[in-house]
Regions:
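Conserved catalytic-core segment of nucleotide-activated headgroup transferases in glycan assembly
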Residues: 203-272, 276, 280-289
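A conserved catalytic-core segment of Leloir-type glycosyltransferases
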Residues: 42-102
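N-terminal subdomain of nucleotide-sugar transferases
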Residues: 1-60
Length: 390
């Protein structure tokens, strides 16, 4: 079976974000399931596709709102209003539908589409109606947009996110309805998308790499707690605001917290132990230098890749319940609480008595369950393909 994996940004091997880590895991699982996979989408500027022989590149594009100029942001808003598309999808209209159709045809004969998230599929929706499809819902995007609207700092942002939520809900409903099968990254997302039946959907348990992270002896602890993420992404920003505003005030003054990742303006902390370190050369080494990892998601849907990485590494953690979306097995060194004061106390206790565990068993269970779910989706798609050919 030859599948066309339709995604906004094609893998470049860097695995710089949770989205890219998830894509790599899903593509690898599809191939383990026996499918030939060709990927189509854009590259980041200055980046090349990791697997050029099996990738169709539509061009280079930077879709990050935080790094866009004010004129470009206004242009995106204007195009979204005129076209009726979401703000997220209109960014991908850097090429015409005709160009995308030509690229699809040049990909060669194939049996179906894997529509990876709503952004690209929503930008060129009608082009993907001629063959059976699987829809991969990384998040319930319309619910995330509603949460973003509630947390928006300005009326303009609030109205923009509300519009995004309305449009996304309709597009997600259409993509799910047309898809022969739907993959989500968290169990609760199946019901939220109206595909809770086992005949319509399955959860994809993810991993951050093909192999479990290797242990290299005792860790060197540089700080009490460490966080790293794309804080300009609104659901992550909401969690960071909660952590800094609600949890950190309960921490001892000498408790050391290091926070890495691109930081939006306005993020500060008066706690003497909090340090913002911007980007770091090695994200894994950074988190392994902490006694405990705070998993602080309070918004959004889908799965938290930082949670998966923490569990694969066997690191101690304190997690909100939202941080465990899509996770069936919680290791013994993970404490769960949504109360800020209890969260702070649990961090201090974990840092005072560091207890790592072997994360390889967690990784192995995730891979096995991922492959089972992928095979189920491929079987559903294969059944439709045979019906069409008949």
């Amino acid at each position: 079976m030859h599948l066309l994996f339709v995604t906004s940004i094609v893998p470049d091997g860097a695995l710089a974000s949770g989205y890219e880590i998830a894509n790599a895991a899903i593509i690898a699982a599809l191939r383990r399931g026996g499918a030939r996979v060709t990927v189509i989408g854009f590259t980041w500027p200055g980046k090349a596709a990791a697997d050029p022989e099996n990738t169709v590149v539509l061009g280079a594009i930077d879709v990050r709102t935080e790094s866009a100029s004010a004129p470009l942001k206004l242009a995106w808003v204007g195009k979204a209003m005129l076209s009726g598309l979401t703000f997220a999808s209109v960014k991908l209209r850097a090429v015409s539908a005709r160009d995308v159709k030509t690229a699809i045809q040049q990909a060669g004969p194939f049996d179906g589409y894997v529509l990876n998230s709503v952004q690209f599929a929503g930008a060129f929706e009608k082009l993907f109606e001629d063959r059976p499809s699987i829809f991969v819902a990384h998040n319930v995007e319309h619910l995330s947009a509603r949460e973003n609207a509630a947390a928006a700092g300005s009326l303009f942002q609030r109205l923009l996110f509300r519009r995004e939520a309305r449009l996304l809900e309709v597009v997600e409903q259409r993509l799910c309805r047309r898809a022969r099968f739907v993959f989500t990254l968290a169990g609760e997302d199946r019901a939220a998308l109206g595909v809770a039946s086992d005949d319509r959907s399955a959860v994809l348990p993810l991993v951050t790499g093909a192999k479990a992270p290797a242990h290299k002896g005792p860790r060197r602890i540089d700080c009490d707690a460490a966080l790293i993420g794309t804080w300009t992404w609104q659901p992550n920003r909401i969690g960071l605001d909660w952590f800094l505003g609600k949890v950190v005030p309960h921490l001892r003054p000498d408790f050391r917290v290091r926070i890495a990742g691109h930081m939006p303006s306005g993020i500060t902390s008066t706690h003497p132990g909090v340090e913002f370190v911007d980007r770091v050369p090695d994200a894994r080494a950074f988190v392994c230098g902490a006694a405990v990892i705070p998993l602080i998601s309070t918004a959004g849907s889908g799965v938290q890749l930082k949670t998966i990485e923490t569990f694969e590494l066997g690191l101690p953690s304190v997690a909100t319940s939202r941080s465990l979306r899509g996770i069936d097995h919680r290791p013994g060194n993970c404490v769960v609480t949504d109360d800020p004061a209890n969260f702070a106390r649990a961090l201090e206790a974990a840092a005072a008595n560091v207890r790592d565990v072997d994360g390889s068993a967690f990784h192995r269970r995730q891979v096995e369950a991922l492959d089972v779910a992928i095979r189920l989706g491929l079987e559903k798609l294969g059944t439709v393909r045979h019906e069409v050919l008949a």
